[in-house]
Amino acid sequence: MEEVYASELRGREPETVDTLFLDNTQGGVIGGINEKLTKLELLSMVKCGLTTLKGMPVLPALNYLDLSDNELGDDASFDVLIKCAPEIKKITLSGNRLTLDNVRTLKMLPNLMELDLSNNSSLGLLDDYRVKMFEMIPSLKILDGCDVDGEEVEEEFAAGEGAEDSDEGDSDEDGPGLSYLNKSQFSDDETDDYVVPEAGDAETRGAKRAASADCDEPEAKKSAE
């Protein structure tokens, strides 16, 4: 994991890193990362063969930890998070070997709002599993992608992006269009540069209008038909 960590830094100072992916790193233990990651908000260690969280440094800004598809079970040591990640809000633990007793410590995380425990077979067999989890962790709002009523909840960042895109679309439709701007510009140009047409010019323009009307007449008839 140390080598992957050094590679993922890509020459950056640890103090500047806010997102770190150490996925698919075998070894079974946390290593390499240190307390210099003071601004780290997202840490992903998917499929790393982890059996414990021992060795995790203090990460004061961490709010999302993804530990999917590891080997976490009786020796998970989630109590480490109480000291190392006091601000954590979301933890993904799908695809591990967890039981209800293994995750009881998570109730000590005061800011934990979202938890994914899907694909943990022992938990899935429990009667009233969802009810027990929401009762056990008072701060919990979302479990396995659904709220306390069992309604599916979209990711916050996805909803925000959608709203932003929607606002941009509305501004294009509801704001002054090109035709309005062109008309306004044309009106200003006419006011500034208007010249009284001479008689010859008027006759010529009248002829052009008549010719134009003749050209448009078949289209008008087609529309009427």
From Swiss-Prot:
Residues 121-161 form the LRRCT domain. InterPro entries: AN32 (IPR045081), LRR_dom_sf (IPR032675). Residues 155-175 have a biased composition (Acidic residues). Residues 155-225 are annotated as: Disordered. LRR repeats lie at residues 39-60, 61-82, 87-107. It comes from the Eukaryota. One of its GO terms (cellular component) is nucleus. Keywords: Leucine-rich repeat, Repeat. One of its GO terms (molecular function) is histone binding. Belongs to the ANP32 family. This is Acidic leucine-rich nuclear phosphoprotein 32-related protein 2.
